[in-house]
């Protein structure tokens, strides 16, 4: 038995599944996810413009 034969055998690669067999519900779900992601990105952009929300809390002096 040579050194190359030892170890775990790799399984044969499976062919990729085609995404052509999606029904209307899956297509609608994907479209809704894209729209939600766009809205989330817009909200992130607006939040970044306004600056941090903190600043009114208790401030620590840093001294001990």
From Swiss-Prot:
Alphabetically ordered keywords of this record: Coiled coil
Top-level taxon: Eukaryota
Pfam families linked to this entry: TMA7
Region annotated Disordered, chain positions: 1-64
Coiled coil feature spans: 21-50
Cited InterPro entries: TMA7
Compositionally skewed regions (Gly residues) per UniProt: 53-64
Start-end of Basic and acidic residues biased regions: 27-45
Family: Belongs to the TMA7 family.
Entry protein name: Translation machinery-associated protein 7
Natural source organism: Xenopus tropicalis (Western clawed frog)
